[in-house]
Amino acid sequence: MPDHSLFRLRILPWCIALAMSGSYSSVWAEDDIQFDSRFLELKGDTKIDLKRFSSQGYVEPGKYNLQVQLNKQPLAEEYDIYWYAGEDDASKSYACLTPELVAQFGLKEDVAKNLQWSHDAKCLKSGQLEGMEIKADLSQSALVISLPQAYLEYTWPDWDPPSRWDDGISGIVADYSINAQTRHEENGGDDSNEISGNGTVGVNLGPWRMRADWQTNYQHTRSNDDDDEFSGDETQKKWEWSRYYAWRALPSLKAKLALGEDYLRSDIFDGFNYVGGSVSTDDQMLPPNLRGYAPDISGVAHTTAKVTVSQMGRVIYETQVPAGPFRIQDLGDSVSGTLHIRIEEQNGQVQEYDISTASMPYLTRPGQVRYKIMMGRPQEWGHHVEGEFFSGAEASWGIANGWSLYGGALGDENYQSAALGVGRDLSTFGAVAFDVTHSHTKLDKDTAYGKGSLDGNSFRVSYSKDFDQLNSRVTFAGYRFSEENFMTMSEYLDASDSGMVRTGNDKEMYTATYNQNFRDAGVSVYLNYTRHTYWDREEQTNYNIMLSHYFNMGSIRNVSISMTGYRYEYDNQADKGMYISLSMPWGDNSTVSYNGNYGSGTDSSQVGYFSRVDDATHYQLNVGTSDKHTSVDGYYSHDGSLAQVDFSANYHEGQYTSAGLSLQGGATLTAHGGALHRTQNMGGTRLLIDADGVADVPVEGNGAAVYTNMFGKAVVSDVNNYYRNQAYIDLNRLPENAEATQSVVQATLTEGAIGYRKFAVISGQKAMAVLRLSDGSHPPFGAEVKNDNEQTVGLVDDDGNVYLAGVKPGEHMSVFWSGVAHCDINLPDPLPADLFNGLLLPCQHKGNVAPITSPAVKPAIQEQTQRVTPTEPPTSISVNQ
C-alpha cells in the first residue's frame, strides 16, 4: 500500500489554521485573536506570521487553486481563486468570482444578464445576489458557495444545466467490434471460419462530431463431404462504409443539429433512412425523468451465440453471449424504430425476429416545447437515394397542469401524413397519451389494387408509469390500430420502388415491458411482450417472461431459481420454449448451477460453474447433454484497459467443435496524447485521463478500472452524455512509487465529446532531506518544494527538514515561500542508497525574488501576500456576497 504522507504534509498548515480559527466563513468576529507561537516549539528564532489566523475567516490575499463547491456539489474543475484585502478593513479578505467561474453556476438567464462586475470586469460585484454565502475551507482546498435555488436553472441529481456542459477537445476516434468464429463438423459437413466486424471512425473539431460507420464480413467454408458435388472451398467477403454523418449540440436550444446520412427518429412517425439534415430537441439534454425509453432486447441462446442488432441493413450492435437468457440494455435512448435481431448459435442454428422499440408518452414540461425539424431525400442501402425531396416537423407543447399537446406533419409530393395528439401527466398514476395520424398516398393505379390514391388513419395510445413504492416499473404499454389503407412513409417508399402495394399490412400492435421486484418475498418478474396483427397475413407474437426467486436454504444464503418462457416468430417460423436455472453460491465469488432448456425440438441440460475473478474478469464452465449427446462449453470475459475480450469454446459429442472470440475497443488521439481503450458506444463520448506521465495508474469510471499507458494516458469510455460523470484513482492500487495529490475529477460532456482531465500524480522515490541556504540558514517553516511541473512534492518543516515525494536522480526543484520561488535545489545523480538519512541539499538563491503580479487581475489583485496597492483600491465586497 503506498505511503500518502505527502498529502498529510500538504494540509499541515491548513490544519493549524483550522485548529486556530475553525472554518473560514464570509461572516467574521469583530475582535482579533492573539496567539502565542511558542506552542509550536520551533527551534531558534524561527518566526511565523499568524496574522492570517487571528481574524476568523481571514484568507491571506493571493492566488489559491481551489475546488469550488456550489450548494455542496463540486464543479468539474479546480479554479485559481484570487483573494484581496478589504477596502475598509485590511484584516478581512474577499474572494474574486470571475465571469468564467460564475458562468458555471447555472444561473437563470434573466439573473445572469443583469450581473455587474468590478475590477475591470474581472470580479463579481458585491451585494447583487441576496442570500449568497462564501466560505473558504482551505483544509480541504475548497471554496464553498451557498446560493439560493431561486437563482439557478432546473437541476437533477447527477445532471447539470447547459452552462456546465463541456464540448471536450479536438481529436480522432476509431472504435471497432470484431467477432471471429470457427466451427468443425465431426461427421462430414462443412467446416467454416468467419470474421465479422463493425465500427466507427471520426474526428472531433470543437463542438462538431464527424463520423463514418463501417461493417465487414469474411467467411470461408470448406466441405468435408466427398460425395457432395459442391464440395471444395468457398470464400465470401465484403467491406462497406455504411454511413457518413456529422452533428453538433446546440445547448442554447437544448437541441442537436445533424447532417448527412441518418435514420428518422420520431416520437410520432415511423422511421426510415434518409440523407439530409435535422434540428431536434435532444432528449439526452433533458433531466433523466423527462428522457425517452432506451430499448431493452431480450432473448435466449441455446448455445454460446453471436447476437447482431441491425436496422435497415445497418449493423448497430454485435456481441457474443453465453448459453441461456440474455438482455441487452446499453443501446441508448437514441435508438428507435424497428430493430432486427439475429442470433447465430454455435451449433449452426439461427434465430431471427423483429422488435418495435416503444415510444414514451410525448410529454413536455409546462411552458416548454420539444420539437424536430427534418428534410432531405429518402435513401436505400448503399448510399442510393430514392423518392422525392421530403420535409417534416413535429412538436410537443406543455400547456399547463400536466397537459401536453403534440402533433406533426411529414411528406413529399405524393405522400403526406399529419398527426395530432394529447398527453397527460397523471402524477402518481403515470403518464398517458393518445394520438391519431392520417396519411394520404398517391400511387400508380397498377400498384394500388386499381386505386389512384389511398387514405387511412392510425390510432395510438401509450402509457408509462414507475411504481416506486412497489419497486416496479411499467416501462411502456401501448396499443396501435391502423386502417387498411393507412401507409407509413417507409411503406410508401417500398410500394413506389417495387411497383406494388406492401405485403404485411399492419393492423394492430400491442407492446408492453414490465419489471417488478417484490423485495420482502425475494421475487422479481420481467415481461416483454409484442403482438402484431396484419390485414393480409397471419399475426406474430413475441414474448419473454422471466420469474426469479431468491431465498436461503439452511446455512446457504442467496440461492436463486429462475424460469424463463419465450417465443420469437419470424417469417412464419417460431422458436419457443422454457429455460430453467437453479444456482447457489460456492465460495465468495463463485456459483454452481443447473440449467435446462426445453422446447423447439431441442432439449438440453447442463451443470455449470461461474466465477468472478475480479471486477473485470469472469468465466463460466458448463457440462451436460444436448439431443442425448454430451456437451462441454466454456465462456471467458475480461474488461481490459485496451479492449473488452470475450472467448468461448464448445464441444458437442459426435456433432461439432467450435470456438469464438470477440474484441471490442478503440483508439483516441488528441493533441494532449492518446490511448487504446475498450469502448461501449461506437464513436461515442469518452474521457481522456492524463496522469502527468505516470504509467499503470488505475482509473475507474462507471465500470472496471483502466490503467494509464506508458505515456500516462488512459481513456474512460463508460461515460454518459450530459450526465455528471466522475472518474477517480484507486489509491489502494497505485504503483509503489506514485503519489496522487488529486484523485477525483468530474465532467459533464456533450454527445460524442472527448473530455480531458488531468490528475496530479507524482512518480519517483521518497526521501527525507535537509535544506540549507547559502548563508547556512534554512527556508522558513511551511515553504513549498515544487518540481519542474509545478507539483508540490514537499513542505519544509522546522529546521529545514522536508519529506520529498517523486524524487528522481538529477531532478531540479524550487523552494517557494510568500508565493515566490526563492531558491533552487538539484538532486544528486545517482541518488544515495539510503534516502531517509537526512539527505543534505543546498538551496541556491535565485537572486530576484520580488513578488509576481498576476496578469489576470492586474493591477488590483496581487499574488499571494502582496497587498492591493493603496493608489488603486478595490471595491470592497460585503459579507453577504
Model-derived segments and their meaning:
Residues 164-228, 369-444, 466, 472, ...:
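Conserved, compact domain cores that house catalytic/ligand-binding motifs in diverse enzymes
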Residues 176-180, 212-216, 257-263, 373-377, ...:
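Transmembrane beta-barrel strands of outer-membrane/channel proteins
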